Amino acid sequence: MNALNQKSPLILLISIILIAIGVVWLFFGTTQASGIDNQQVTDMLGRIVEIPSETNKVASISASTTVELFMLAPEKMIGWNEKRTSEENVYMKSTYSGLPVIGGGKKDANYENIISMNPDIVLIGHGGTDNQVDQIQSKFGSIPTLDVEGDNNLTSIKPSLEFLGKVLGKKEQSDKLISFYNDITKEVNSTVSTIPESERKKVYYARDSTGLMTNPPGSTHTQLIEICGGKNVVEAPLTKGSVGVSMELILQWNPDVIITSNQQFYDNIYFNSLWADVKAVKEKQVYMVPTSPFNWFEGPPGANTIIGIPWTAKVLYPDKFQDMDINKITKEFYTEYYHYNLSDQEATNILSSSGLKNT
């Protein structure tokens, strides 16, 4: 009887330990089996958000973060913000171009549709204030939302790529893209920084079919002009959107180069008598921005315009960038970041269609 009494505390202790082990195993075993394995991250507004340790399905409700998502992890995308055109899809694999339209941007997101697709996280580009992003979070319920800053500004884009590389588990890909950006920016800047102010090209960017909608200096939509050593001729205050100008003003500014993203304007400008006396038209210095799979110049401003740096440099100063192999650069960029292997002929077609004479 005494021996039994002496063993009772030991038996009780062992029983408690076994029960505790069972509870711990049950909790963690169930958690792993259910795929619940979370981590805390601090988004780019400083919000602490709990997200899955591994993200496999990602939604984006901003065009610029959607582009970054595609460049870093296309296999994780659940869809596009809006319907893509056949022209935009020329140089995109059908695997990606065929993804569904999930609906809208920050102001008109189709929350019900996105929630039904059960993404692991939702990306919000340049979301504004904590309160504004929290309001979006409340509409997504338990699906975590992350704010990404600098995604729509080429001069401050690197932190956004670093952040997404970490969140998406694509650090190697984001590091590679940042390295590409650094190298091409350094190459272009080392040349254009030596150009005297008096010799810098005057540039006008035409946004629409009339050519009379544009963006002033300081706009993210025209920042490639300044990055590549040009001078934006528009004399208008910086606004959030585009601005309308008159033909009289354009004749007064008399740009050396005109760049446009509008195919109709590009096709017609040399036959339009209103533009005939503009220096860029007289000297055949009008260029059409490549737009497949994304615009090289803007629309949206962001990571897609990295390839626009060497292109704009060649457009503005072809004599100073004779040794830059834009064909090779284009093929590399498309392979690595647009996941499409351009043939030599396709690269040539893209560049010659833009108006570049010597590629």
What do the PLM-derived regions correspond to, one by one?
Residues T155-K166, D175, Y266-T359:
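Structured C-terminal subdomain patch of bacterial secreted/periplasmic proteins
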